[in-house]
Amino acid sequence: MNTLSQAIKAYNSNDYQLALKLFEKSAEIYGRKIVEFQITKCKEKLSAHPSVNSAHLSVNKEEKVNVCDSPLDIATQLLLSNVKKLVLSDSEKNTLKNKWKLLTEKKSENAEVRAVALVPKDFPKDLVLAPLPDHVNDFTWYKKRKKRLGIKPEHQHVGLSIIVTTFNRPAILSITLACLVNQKTHYPFEVIVTDDGSQEDLSPIIRQYENKLDIRYVRQKDNGFQASAARNMGLRLAKYDFIGLLDCDMAPNPLWVHSYVAELLEDDDLTIIGPRKYIDTQHIDPKDFLNNASLLESLPEVKTNNSVAAKGEGTVSLDWRLEQFEKTENLRLSDSPFRFFAAGNVAFAKKWLNKSGFFDEEFNHWGGEDVEFGYRLFRYGSFFKTIDGIMAYHQEPPGKENETDREAGKNITLDIMREKVPYIYRKLLPIEDSHINRVPLVSIYIPAYNCANYIQRCVDSALNQTVVDLEVCICNDGSTDNTLEVINKLYGNNPRVRIMSKPNGGIASASNAAVSFAKGYYIGQLDSDDYLEPDAVELCLKEFLKDKTLACVYTTNRNVNPDGSLIANGYNWPEFSREKLTTAMIAHHFRMFTIRAWHLTDGFNEKIENAVDYDMFLKLSEVGKFKHLNKICYNRVLHGDNTSIKKLGIQKKNHFVVVNQSLNRQGITYYNYDEFDDLDESRKYIFNKTAEYQEEIDILKDIKIIQNKDAKIAVSIFYPNTLNGLVKKLNNIIEYNKNIFVIVLHVDKNHLTPDIKKEILAFYHKHQVNILLNNDISYYTSNRLIKTEAHLSNINKLSQLNLNCEYIIFDNHDSLFVKNDSYAYMKKYDVGMNFSALTHDWIEKINAHPPFKKLIKTYFNDNDLKSMNVKGASQGMFMTYALAHELLTIIKEVITSCQSIDSVPEYNTEDIWFQFALLILEKKTGHVFNKTSTLTYMPWERKLQWTNEQIESAKRGENIPVNKFIINSITL
């Protein structure tokens, strides 16, 4: 019998002195919060009956365990019993199980469903909501969102603090430090070597580099494996805004510092993960690395015995993560990118330590501590990415840390990690196999204010869920009645209930406090006067587990009287759409959301009194997908004092305020969502164009289309998002294409600022080149058709004007022409495209796309895909104007087919559809067109930002590999 069970037994036997002693001991084991109430009760009993010696009192051993005056809920008793923290007899346990089954057997009723239009009929056709991320770690989407919101990083001390954790291995450490000396960067950096209690004296190694590096050395006592504590020691000393972590056996390449800092300066919400290769340095002198900066990258890769961090195939070992990096587009499409966070080569902004905390020092064996730390970064909203340029080289053999150490350590820490990382590593278990995890999978939060009369029914409904991997977080918001006393009396000793109290701040303030207090990954919302059906959490949770891209799952509710009698089923809009949510609060109770999605918003708005939930769920709908379940899982108690039915005038005002704020966050400034009438209870609305929009959008009306017999070329450009760098792009086109007749720009008209309009007009007057603006295709879509659709729309615009063109170039906003006198080059050919083989991944995506697969099978055999050269980036693609019309006719048929069955491709269509259309046309006509490559190039590094020297070098044709595009981000 454990200490807590002994304490309970002693209390129930009236041996309060012994019980107090045992409860005090239990507090040291389980935490004082769990037994604080019992300790108080023991002291009260002893104070009232100081002479009682209960040791001689008889106790019925079969008597039901009673936890002081505040019995635990049934599920909690069973969970404690499963791990021997509460002793129950078999009969007691069976009795509790039967009671729990009765409590949880009720199933939520189906809600009434009717057919509805997903998009309201009065929703403006040109009002397109901002795109959602492709996945939970879509760092590309997040970067665009921050730019739209005007969020810019603030840095005080730009530089990299490099924490190098070590234990013995002086030679290997010296090589790593030598490679840090060889860094090629203008960014400042420091090196903090943190020693986890080495027996060998490492100070001579450090002194060798004192004049070569900004270096510090700190050591902690050898208390076994304490890598987390060693890293934390270094993190607390860091002086720069950015943190880089290296293990002592990870030698960084010469661009390691520069690559990390440059990436974090661009987006300090990233956590950047570096890959590794395996090399053998045991017979190389560290001085050789100091004298030869290129030595590291010239060493051959080796096969290691490290099966935990590498997979061995053939003669070398590979970083097991590389395959996942490729499959997930450098982790952009990963649902759990923190799994690849290995602290031997990573970087992040120091600000995240204030949000997610430091490394967990409970991990005192090899492995797990970095994944758990990465999970917290992910939970609080960091985005994970791997990039080129941050390779580090793992020096083999592993030295004093052998393979057995790693495997044994991982087996120990895996259990700790499962306790503390509920997302991904936790699955739903029956209550017989469950226990109370230190970090629950689900948290239900309850803001509580003056609710003493009904808080018990509310909390009990949360505890009596079919999902038991759950905690309840109650925030007492400065109640003036005895709410806090009731909560503490009923749940103060319950390990699945966490209680906090604060001065009154209103529902938004209490909600923010409670959600911040919660430990779970999935968060459920419950008002203190309401209660849940037993399967509410389970129904929602199963949807989250099926689709990791979901930010929110919600059900519907019924309205009941305080005694539980039915008033009526609540309003239920049967299917979610963002457009409908923009016009009405359709996200009904019960609602669950992910804590990560919540951290991507600014939380509940504490400046408004009503419409707080509407505002919050609009925010959540901007950062992830919603799913609605037509189940009645929530009982909404109407007692006349509900915040949602009080102060209707303020409620209505804020309803329209929060919708307009949502539109503004999405960059939609050309519509206002306005009240239709003055009735407080009415939510009738109308969308009105803003004054800014009403201004004539085309101040470029002075541009007249002028036919020039010497001008032969049309250019179609897709220009996403903002138009920064537009004139720079136009000037580049003119510089290399003297025969340009017309440029048609597919743009988002919301970014046509007065300054940009003036720049376009000035360009037109200077060069007398016709410019057409097109905005037919919505920019706020994440599908892979958009660029192809934009080019198709552009050529349709040209056709409507009956313009006489000879060639057309299809280009991107961020490519750079380097082929002088393009027309002289083009007129030798019918078409310029890039043609290369399809990878296995591309073939799989094509076969998974029915409309395009059907088209291919019409003209080609199944095996043709493996041998056909039909893939190539589309920048700088050109063809005769007549041929473009024929190809786009074929492409339009495919787009129509896609739209008819709502089948969106999972690949960039512009990279293969033009090539396939050309081959199909050749098959249909029997004519083989004269083909060549495109007009622009790109160096192997695929750099996104070039120096002026690099641009001029490219223009001269220097250092450009054949058939490689230059992707030059001239918009930056």
UniProtKB/Swiss-Prot annotation:
Keywords: Cell membrane, Glycosyltransferase, Membrane, Multifunctional enzyme, Repeat, Transferase. Its cofactor is Mg(2+); Co(2+). Its EC number is 2.4.1.212, 2.4.1.226. Residues 152-325 are annotated as: A1. The keyword Lyase does not apply. One of its GO terms (molecular function) is hyaluronan synthase activity. Changing D529E: 90% loss of GlcUA transferase activity. It catalyses: [hyaluronan](n) + UDP-N-acetyl-alpha-D-glucosamine = N-acetyl-beta-D-glucosaminyl-(1->4)-[hyaluronan](n) + UDP + H(+); N-acetyl-beta-D-glucosaminyl-(1->4)-[hyaluronan](n) + UDP-alpha-D-glucuronate = [hyaluronan](n+1) + UDP + H(+); 3-O-(beta-D-GalNAc-(1->4)-beta-D-GlcA-(1->3)-beta-D-Gal-(1->3)-beta-D-Gal-(1->4)-beta-D-Xyl)-L-seryl-[protein] + UDP-alpha-D-glucuronate = 3-O-(beta-D-GlcA-(1->3)-beta-D-GalNAc-(1->4)-beta-D-GlcA-(1->3)-beta-D-Gal-(1->3)-beta-D-Gal-(1->4)-beta-D-Xyl)-L-seryl-[protein] + UDP + H(+); 3-O-{[beta-D-GalNAc-(1->4)-beta-D-GlcA-(1->3)](n)-beta-D-GalNAc-(1->4)-beta-D-GlcA-(1->3)-beta-D-Gal-(1->3)-beta-D-Gal-(1->4)-beta-D-Xyl}-L-seryl-[protein] + UDP-alpha-D-glucuronate = 3-O-{beta-D-GlcA-(1->3)-[beta-D-GalNAc-(1->4)-beta-D-GlcA-(1->3)](n)-beta-D-GalNAc-(1->4)-beta-D-GlcA-(1->3)-beta-D-Gal-(1->3)-beta-D-Gal-(1->4)-beta-D-Xyl}-L-seryl-[protein] + UDP + H(+). InterPro entries: Glyco_trans_2-like, Glycosyltransf_2, Nucleotide-diphossugar_trans. Pfam families: Glycos_transf_2. Residues 432-604 are annotated as: A2. It is a peripheral membrane protein. One of its GO terms (cellular component) is plasma membrane. This is Hyaluronan synthase.
